């Protein structure tokens, strides 16, 4: 105890006890390292099927060398917000590289995807606007949408008929994801682009989990689905998943970026990402653009895993991306299955409410190009035959 009185206006213990009783209490696990699809915890080695390091770049020697060189040149921190002295030539070069890669006019860097998403919504939407969101959008988008003065309307997951019924002309912003973080399926971007253009509303993609993995040169969901970058007004992506570093960006028109520089409080009032980090991300993009074989290997692993789980009788979501959700149903059952896998040397995280809807607790299994075929086979052996699980049918409707 730190000597402060426990009593007061906040009932913390009761809230924690309630979550623990419902098998929803979250606890952190301190790892001793995570490299190349492996994880070490308390001196024991595990196969790691929980990370978002989709291309296995988080321990790449070339990226690490770029990071170290950046530290030698620029130090360990940027030292200020980007509008003071925290914006360097290395940041500018990264923005230009991203704009060229993704086919947008300009890019703005953020410290993380959560702040990038919230910065955009808060800067753009006022009381006279409308915001349309997929029900399964990331918590950063849902949370900010609920706090804004505009009216937020949520449509059923990937339900374009429902969205079209809700739309009003020239009223605001439609937001959806490229690859949904808990289900691994993709948004229908040709149809989203059509509806946005038809209604005169802006369109934003959160492509945190598609960037680097999908499309030619890893340009993401839009490129994979043949949607022109100009059809989507705002692109958000992150560097901490397939790119193996950390940070995020927002891309679009030069006017959009200039506006965010002036009105996005998350950008204006935050210390900028370390310059050395920008150097590492720039090097990562070089590798990602040339990583066709890694993406092909990853696709083969996904196919192998899906075929193997089908043979064992497990229920997977309709995903062809590295995110493979194995539906369990009850939170306690998901925790028990995750514990069983850990006993067998495989680390997979159980995802429970409120991250996912009640009754849809799951194992969020993520594959990486760092995995080998024998790693996938070991995961399948650890899972074993299904002894009964929930069904995906009808989960996302209504």
Swiss-Prot record:
Biological processes annotated in GO: biotin biosynthetic process
Major enzyme class: transferase
Transmembrane segments: none
Pathways per UniProt: Cofactor biosynthesis; biotin biosynthesis
Assigned keywords, A-Z: Biotin biosynthesis, Pyridoxal phosphate, Transferase
Pfam families with a match to the protein in the record: Aminotran_1_2
Residue numbers bearing the N6-(pyridoxal phosphate)lysine modification: 241
Catalyzed reactions per annotation: 6-carboxyhexanoyl-[ACP] + L-alanine + H(+) = (8S)-8-amino-7-oxononanoate + holo-[ACP] + CO2
Keyword Transmembrane helix part of the UniProt annotation: no
GO molecular function (one): 8-amino-7-oxononanoate synthase activity
Cofactor: pyridoxal 5'-phosphate
InterPro entries, A to Z: Aminotrans_II_pyridoxalP_BS, Aminotransferase_I/II_large, AON_synthase_class-II, AONS_Archaea/Proteobacteria, AONS_Proteobacteria, PyrdxlP-dep_Trfase, PyrdxlP-dep_Trfase_major, PyrdxlP-dep_Trfase_small
The EC number(s) this enzyme carries: 2.3.1.47
Similarity field: Belongs to the class-II pyridoxal-phosphate-dependent aminotransferase family. BioF subfamily.
Function statement: Catalyzes the decarboxylative condensation of pimeloyl-[acyl-carrier protein] and L-alanine to produce 8-amino-7-oxononanoate (AON), [acyl-carrier protein], and carbon dioxide.
HAMAP family tied to this protein: BioF_aminotrans_2 (MF_01693)
Subunit relationships: Homodimer.
Protein name: 8-amino-7-oxononanoate synthase
Gene: bioF
């Amino acid at each position: 105890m730190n000597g402060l009185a426990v009593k007061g206006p906040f009932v913390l213990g009761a809230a924690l006890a309630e979550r623990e009783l419902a098998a929803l209490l979250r606890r952190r696990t301190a790892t001793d390292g995570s490299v190349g699809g492996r994880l070490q915890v308390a001196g024991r080695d595990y196969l790691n099927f929980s990370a978002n390091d989709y291309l296995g770049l988080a321990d790449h020697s070339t990226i690490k060398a770029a990071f170290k060189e950046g530290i030698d040149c620029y130090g360990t921190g940027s030292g200020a917000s980007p509008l003071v002295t925290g914006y360097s030539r290395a940041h500018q070069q990264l923005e230009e590289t991203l704009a060229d890669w993704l086919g947008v006019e300009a890019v703005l860097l953020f410290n993380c995807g959560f702040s990038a998403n919230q910065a955009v919504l808060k800067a753009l939407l006022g009381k006279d606007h409308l915001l349309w969101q997929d029900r399964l959008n990331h918590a950063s988008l849902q949370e900010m949408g609920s706090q804004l003065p505009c009216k937020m309307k949520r449509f059923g997951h990937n339900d374009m008929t429902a969205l079209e019924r809700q739309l009003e002309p020239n009223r605001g912003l439609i937001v959806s994801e490229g690859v949904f973080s808990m289900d691994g399926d993709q948004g229908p971007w040709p149809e989203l682009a059509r509806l946005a253009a038809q209604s005169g509303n802006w369109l934003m993609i959160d492509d945190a989990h598609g960037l680097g993995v999908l499309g030619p040169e890893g340009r993401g969901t839009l490129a994979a689905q043949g949607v022109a970058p100009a059809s989507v007004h705002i692109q958000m992506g992150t560097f901490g998943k397939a790119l193996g570093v950390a940070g995020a960006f927002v891309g679009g028109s030069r006017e959009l970026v200039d506006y965010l520089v002036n009105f996005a409080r998350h950008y204006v009032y935050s210390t900028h990402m370390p310059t050395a980090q920008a150097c590492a991300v720039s090097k990562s993009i070089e590798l990602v653009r040339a990583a066709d074989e890694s993406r092909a290997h990853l696709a083969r692993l996904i196919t192998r895993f899906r075929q193997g789980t089908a043979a064992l009788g497990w229920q997977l979501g309709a995903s062809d991306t590295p995110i493979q959700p194995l539906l369990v149903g009850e939170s306690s059952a998901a925790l028990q299955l995750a514990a069983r896998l850990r006993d067998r040397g495989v680390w997979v995280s159980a995802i429970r409410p409120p991250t996912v809807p009640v009754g849809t607790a799951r194992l969020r299994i993520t594959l990486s190009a760092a995995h080998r075929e024998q790693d996938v086979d070991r995961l399948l052996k650890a899972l074993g035959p299904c002894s009964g699980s929930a069904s995906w049918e009808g989960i996302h409707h209504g």
